[in-house]
A protein has these predicted regions:
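Structural preference for solvent-exposed beta-strand-turn elements
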Residues: 1-425
Length: 425
């Protein structure tokens, strides 16, 4: 797919529903008593993998176009699957469902695509094993495919080495099936959608600082969920408006959960003109409309506790830094190496191909901004966030940019290119 420089981006857009919340709505709805109704569900490939997995576990899920209905069977209503669960490209599905399956009364095997088969699963296998789970890497390499023999679990107090919502959520979900209380402490607070939504469904979840605790014994009850727009999808339009001169974009109804809104804070630190309008609250999640205008940016240092709040948006930050005056430093972001691709290496190589002055480090990147970018052949490595980042970067660069594997955006944003084209007209 070919992209070229564009004139000002103007208009209003509504981005798809939040991917993290969409995944969890299916999982928690399946474990609840009664029918959970979900509107603005993200029908990206990852979330559809979650639906397929829970259908294979005996849950009736209806897709009525305008809404998703999950006919839950309670915490102990899942049944043994008829075949290996296919998680596709979804790390969220893999890690969260493993916590649920660890406490069932049957054995499950799960696998995914080539990317999933290289992503680290020891980070969930170790705490689940401490809880009494029987979970193994079938190839004995710490990655999928996984085999999980359901067991009687017991609560633990676990200190995680990484600030990962997937690890935390996996342990908390296993904790619903454990004897005694389970707690997870992180080095920094990761996104907290699991804690918010499980509380909404009736679970006994408490949070203090970077520790989340679940006490089992309460049934979950069906809910009505309105999924806010995904700030990770909004990020590309935020960046495009900031990069392309004279642009102004209004992005409607975006989730601005403080554990997810690090991009807004970093962009504003860089000098971005971003205004929050119509701030609201629904299902425990804050939302707002975002009005973004082209801005002159300057370099910043991005590190520490802000990293988990924008881990998926760091490729966008790296691209924005190329258009900012001065130096931008990203550090404490080792997690970028174990995403759908090694996002440090991929961003460095692709931005260099476009003329950027960028160096990779063991835990991030250093970018010298202010040098003009030019078109190049970009390898997305079939990573949706890489493809979308370079699609918008090309709009502010000279010449033609060709993106290999551009259709991988269907993982999280099937209509991305259509929305981008509409704003560029």
């Amino acid at each position: 797919m070919i992209f070229t420089r564009t004139n000002a981006l103007k208009g209003e857009i509504t981005v798809p529903g939040d991917k993290s919340i969409s995944h969890r709505s299916i999982m928690f709805g399946a474990l609840a008593e009664g029918t959970t109704r979900v509107t603005n569900f993200l029908r990206g490939a990852d979330c559809l993998s979650t639906i397929d997995c829970f259908r294979n576990l005996g849950i009736d899920i209806e897709d009525l176009d305008s809404e998703i209905l999950i006919h839950g069977k309670g915490l102990h209503g899942l049944t043994a699957p008829s075949s290996m669960l296919d998680v596709g490209n979804s790390g969220t599905t893999t890690r969260l469902i493993s916590g649920i399956l660890a406490g069932q009364r049957f054995t499950t095997e799960l696998n995914g695509d080539e990317s999933i088969q290289s992503r680290p699963m020891k980070r969930i296998m170790e705490p689940l094993t401490l809880m009494g789970a029987d979970i193994t890497s079938i190839r004995d390499n710490g990655c999928a495919p996984l085999r999980i023999h359901g067991q009687k679990l017991h609560g633990i107090a676990y200190t995680s080495k990484v600030a990962s919502a997937q690890v935390k959520s996996c342990i908390l979900l296993a904790g619903l099936y454990a004897d005694g209380t389970t707690s997870v402490t992180e080095p920094y607070l990761s996104r907290n959608h699991t804690e918010i939504m499980l509380t909404h469904f009736g679970a006994d979840i408490t949070s203090k600082g970077t520790t989340a605790t679940v006490t089992p014994g309460k049934d979950l009850h069906a809910q009505e969920i309105i999924v806010p727009g995904d700030i990770s999808s909004a990020a590309y339009f935020i960046a495009a408006a900031l990069m392309v001169p004279d642009s102004e974009i209004l992005i409607k109804n975006v989730g601005i959960n403080p554990t997810r809104n690090g991009l807004l804070r970093v962009c504003q630190d860089m000098g971005a003109d971003i205004t929050l309008l119509n701030e609201n609250y629904g299902n425990g999640e804050p939302t707002a409309d975002l009005l973004v205008r082209h801005s002159e940016l300057h370099g910043v240092t991005v590190c520490g506790s802000v990293i988990p709040t924008l881990i998926d948006e760091l490729p966008v930050v790296a691209a924005l830094a190329c258009f900012a005056r001065g130096t931008t430093v990203i550090r404490d972001a080792q997690e970028l190496k174990v995403k759908e691709s090694n996002r440090i290496d991929v961003m460095v190589n692709n931005l260099r191909a476009m003329g950027a002055h960028i160096e990779g480090t063991d835990d991030g990147m250093i970018i010298e901004g202010g040098y003009p970018l030019h078109g190049a052949i970009i390898d997305s490595h079939l990573d949706h966030r890489i493809a979308m980042t370079f699609a918008i970067t090309a709009l502010a660069s000279d010449g033609k940019t060709s993106i290999k594997g551009a259709d991988c955006v269907k993982i999280s944003y099937p209509g991305f290119y259509e929305d981008l084209t509409r704003l560029a007209k």
